[in-house]
Amino acid sequence: MRMMFSPELVNPPFGDPGLIVDFNVERRALLFDLGDIAGLAPRKILRVSDVFVSHTHMDHFVGFDLMLRLCLGRPTSLRLFGPPGFAAQVEHKLAAYTWNLIENEPSSTRIGSTRRASCT
């Protein structure tokens, strides 16, 4: 029986946190926490459709820049999910870059927030 997904730690147990879950039946993956992702092959990073960040301490968010660099200009969306205030933190990181080299590139960035719902 073929597994539908393959979970893999991004780094050794005492390295930056990260778990990638690659869906074997689809061309996509989920990434939980965005620590140091330099050890992942670019082709694997490009499969990521959704990133879930638990909090933005450096060891959980330092991989954002590499993810951004690889995903700029790709035709598919990358969705980021995080704790309250996360959208503003992402917006500040994006604002810190000079974007003059990609003026003619078709790209779209949407930043928004959603609310958490709970059932009791």
Model-derived segments and spans:
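Binuclear metal-dependent hydrolase catalytic cores
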Residues: 1-120
